[in-house]
A protein has these predicted regions:
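Rossmann-like flavin
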Residues: 1-4
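Short glycine/proline-rich turn/loop motifs
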Residues: 10-17, 190
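Helical element adjacent to the flavin cofactor pocket in flavoenzyme catalytic cores
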Residues: 14-53
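Mid-domain catalytic core of redox enzymes
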Residues: 22, 52-167
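Generic, well-ordered alpha-helical scaffold segments in large soluble proteins
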Residues: 33, 37, 41, 80, ...
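C-terminal catalytic lobe of FAD-dependent flavoproteins
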Residues: 167-223
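Conserved small/polar residues in nucleotide/adenosyl-binding loops
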Residues: 226-229
Length: 229
């Protein structure tokens, strides 16, 4: 409430509320189509290629240095990561004022979204062609997941476009805002190699999120085949 921008309000209103569009077959097809277009125009995509520095000439970023020592030269470099991390990769430069760099670096991070995916029994719940927002109380600004009480502040329920019979739900996504700080203890670990405490927390949050949604949509409980965080 104290820090949300006009952009946040516009995105929430026009994307999450008025424009709850869905893709039959999932959104991976968008990434696949983009990848195909890049290759069609002679482009190359590098995966597992960590960037360690952005090199500048004058007032422009002209090169990307990878961890394996390769240097990629380009007329235009687009960074889609946190601005503070982008500045760290650029390093000291007169182009970015020190006061601005420090201000960006001192801004508090916002929250992330914890997601749970529910596979449903076929032909049990009619397709829900809209987003549903469930709140724990009347104060809609208290939305963060309470890790001490193990309870969501709010949950967004969104049904994926069915792959089979369009009249029935087959997959439901639950999303709830959660602070990023509790996860910092595992920021150095890799997917598939997380400590037991990490997986235990995700399992507990998944169950709490599912329970929260089922309390407000009771018919969901008996239709669950599988849940996954």
């Amino acid at each position: 409430r104290e820090s949300s921008t006009l952009d946040h309000h516009a995105m929430g209103n026009h994307s999450n509320i008025e424009g709850a569009c869905r893709f039959t077959g999932g959104t991976q097809q968008i990434a696949d189509a983009l990848a195909a277009k890049i290759r069609e125009h002679g482009g190359t995509m590098l995966v597992r290629s960590r960037v360690v520095a952005l090199h500048t000439e004058g007032r422009r970023v002209t090169g990307v240095e990878l961890a394996d020592g390769r240097m990629l030269r380009a007329k235009t470099v687009i960074s889609a990561i946190h601005p503070a991390e982008t500045f760290r990769l650029i390093g000291p430069t007169p182009v970015i004022r020190k006061a601005f760099r420090e201000r960006i670096g001192s801004l508090p991070d916002s929250y992330g979204l914890f997601s749970a995916y529910l596979l449903l029994k076929p032909g049990r719940i009619p397709y829900i062609n809209r987003n549903l927002y469930y709140f724990a109380g009347k104060d809609v600004w208290k939305t963060l997941f309470d890790l001490e009480a193990m309870r969501p502040g709010m949950v967004l329920l969104s049904a994926q476009a069915p792959d089979g019979d369009p009249a029935w739900c087959d997959v439901v996504t639950l999303m709830t805002p959660v602070a990023t700080r509790p996860w910092e203890a595992w920021e150095g670990s890799a997917p598939g190699r997380r400590p037991e405490a990490y997986t235990a927390l995700k399992a507990a949050m998944t169950q709490a999120t599912v329970d929260f949604a089922c309390a407000r949509l009771p018919e969901l409980r008996d239709c669950l085949l599988y849940t996954s965080p």
